[in-house]
Amino acid sequence: MKPTVISAEALFEAHRTALRWEWLAGHAHPERRFDEVAVRDAQSAADLVGYLNYIHPYRVQIVGRREVRYLVDVPPEDQERRISRIVTLEPPVVIVADQQTPPDRLVAMCERADIPLFVTEESAGHVIDVLRAHLSQHFADRTTRHGVFMDILGLGVLLTGESGLGKSELGLELISRGHGLVADDAVDLYRVSQTALEGRCPDLLLNLLEVRGIGLLDIKAIFGETAVRRKMRLKLIVHLVRKETMERDFERLPYEPLYEDVLDVPVLKAVIAVDAGRNLAVLVEAAVRNTILKLRGIDTYQEFIARHRIAMEGDEPI
C-alpha cells in the first residue's frame, strides 16, 4: 500500500530551505491535499507535478516565465478568463517560479479560493525536479520484508531465509569484510519507479544488528561511518535454505535465472544452501559478482550451454 495524502503545509515545510519559497496566498486551508483518486491513478510523480496545464488540473501547477507571459500579455478580459480557469480547476498548489512576480489577479483569486500559492526565485525546471523526487518517494508503493539488507560490492542485496539460519551472523561477517549494512530484521522497501526498488531502515533500528547470544550491536559505533548506508537500490535477493530444502525444491543448475516479485518488480534471486563447513560470506560475494555480470549482459551458464551445444554438434572436440 502507499499513502494517498500530503498537505500543502507539509510540502511547503519540506522544501522551505531548498527552494527558498514564500507562501503568498491561500493560508486559510494549509491542510489542503492532493486529490486521492489522482494519486492512486498516477503512474509516476510526473503525473502529479508539471507546468501549467488545464487538462491535468489535479497536479501541482508550475507557473514559469512563459506561463506568466501567457497569463498577462493579453487584454484584461482574457487575463481574467485564463486565471479564473486555473482557480476553477482547484489544483492542490500553484507555484510561481523563474523569479516571476505573480499577477495580482492570480494572488487575489487564490486567496479567495483558498488555493495555496507559493512563490520562489528558483527555476521552474528545478522546482519540478525537486517536487517530483519528493512526491515519488512520498507516494511510492511500499512494503516491509524480513531479512538483512546490505551494500555488497555496490549492489543492494537482501538476505532472506527461515529464522535460525544465521542471516544476521552472515551480515556481521560481510560487514567485517568491508561491506555495508542498510537494515537488519525489518527492511522498508519502496517502489520509486516502475522498475526500481529502494530499501531503507526504519528509524527505530537504524545502524543496529541483532546477533543471537550477543544482542544488539551498533554497527556504526563499532565499525565506523563507512560500515552503514542510508539506503540502496534492491538488485538481488539471496535466499538461505536448509540443505534438504535445497535438494527437494530447487534445481542444482537452474536453466533460467530465478526472480522474485517485490511490489510487482522482478528482482534477481540466488538460493544458497546452509550446511556445516560452507563459507556463506564467500558464496554470497560470488553470487553478487555473478549478478553484476548478468546485469552487464554476461550469463556464464548460457555461455556454458552454448559451448556444450557446439561440442555436441561435433564442431569442437569434447
UniProtKB/Swiss-Prot annotation:
<dbReference type="InterPro" id="IPR011104">
    <property type="entry name" value="Hpr_kin/Pase_C"/>
</dbReference>
<protein>
    <recommendedName>
        <fullName>HPr kinase/phosphorylase</fullName>
        <ecNumber>2.7.11.-</ecNumber>
        <ecNumber>2.7.4.-</ecNumber>
    </recommendedName>
</protein>
<dbReference type="GO" id="GO:0004712">
    <property type="term" value="F:protein serine/threonine/tyrosine kinase activity"/>
</dbReference>
<dbReference type="GO" id="GO:0006109">
    <property type="term" value="P:regulation of carbohydrate metabolic process"/>
</dbReference>
<feature type="binding site">
    <location>
        <position position="210"/>
    </location>
    <ligand>
        <name>Mg(2+)</name>
    </ligand>
</feature>
<keyword id="KW-0547">Nucleotide-binding</keyword>
<feature type="binding site">
    <location>
        <begin position="161"/>
        <end position="168"/>
    </location>
    <ligand>
        <name>ATP</name>
    </ligand>
</feature>
<feature type="active site">
    <location>
        <position position="252"/>
    </location>
</feature>
<feature type="region of interest" description="Important for the catalytic mechanism of dephosphorylation">
    <location>
        <begin position="273"/>
        <end position="278"/>
    </location>
</feature>
<keyword id="KW-0067">ATP-binding</keyword>
<feature type="active site">
    <location>
        <position position="146"/>
    </location>
</feature>
<dbReference type="InterPro" id="IPR003755">
    <property type="entry name" value="HPr(Ser)_kin/Pase"/>
</dbReference>
<keyword id="KW-0479">Metal-binding</keyword>
<dbReference type="InterPro" id="IPR011126">
    <property type="entry name" value="Hpr_kin/Pase_Hpr_N"/>
</dbReference>
<comment type="subunit">
    <text>Homohexamer.</text>
</comment>
<dbReference type="Pfam" id="PF02603">
    <property type="entry name" value="Hpr_kinase_N"/>
</dbReference>
<dbReference type="InterPro" id="IPR027417">
    <property type="entry name" value="P-loop_NTPase"/>
</dbReference>
<dbReference type="GO" id="GO:0000155">
    <property type="term" value="F:phosphorelay sensor kinase activity"/>
</dbReference>
<keyword id="KW-0460">Magnesium</keyword>
<comment type="function">
    <text>Catalyzes the ATP- as well as the pyrophosphate-dependent phosphorylation of a specific serine residue in HPr, a phosphocarrier protein of the phosphoenolpyruvate-dependent sugar phosphotransferase system (PTS). HprK/P also catalyzes the pyrophosphate-producing, inorganic phosphate-dependent dephosphorylation (phosphorolysis) of seryl-phosphorylated HPr (P-Ser-HPr).</text>
</comment>
<dbReference type="InterPro" id="IPR028979">
    <property type="entry name" value="Ser_kin/Pase_Hpr-like_N_sf"/>
</dbReference>
<dbReference type="Pfam" id="PF07475">
    <property type="entry name" value="Hpr_kinase_C"/>
</dbReference>
<feature type="active site">
    <location>
        <position position="167"/>
    </location>
</feature>
<keyword id="KW-0723">Serine/threonine-protein kinase</keyword>
<comment type="similarity">
    <text>Belongs to the HPrK/P family.</text>
</comment>
<dbReference type="GO" id="GO:0005524">
    <property type="term" value="F:ATP binding"/>
</dbReference>
<keyword id="KW-0418">Kinase</keyword>
<keyword id="KW-0511">Multifunctional enzyme</keyword>
<feature type="binding site">
    <location>
        <position position="168"/>
    </location>
    <ligand>
        <name>Mg(2+)</name>
    </ligand>
</feature>
<dbReference type="GO" id="GO:0000287">
    <property type="term" value="F:magnesium ion binding"/>
</dbReference>
<feature type="active site" description="Proton acceptor; for phosphorylation activity. Proton donor; for dephosphorylation activity">
    <location>
        <position position="185"/>
    </location>
</feature>
<feature type="region of interest" description="Important for the catalytic mechanism of both phosphorylation and dephosphorylation">
    <location>
        <begin position="209"/>
        <end position="218"/>
    </location>
</feature>
<dbReference type="GO" id="GO:0004674">
    <property type="term" value="F:protein serine/threonine kinase activity"/>
</dbReference>
<keyword id="KW-0808">Transferase</keyword>
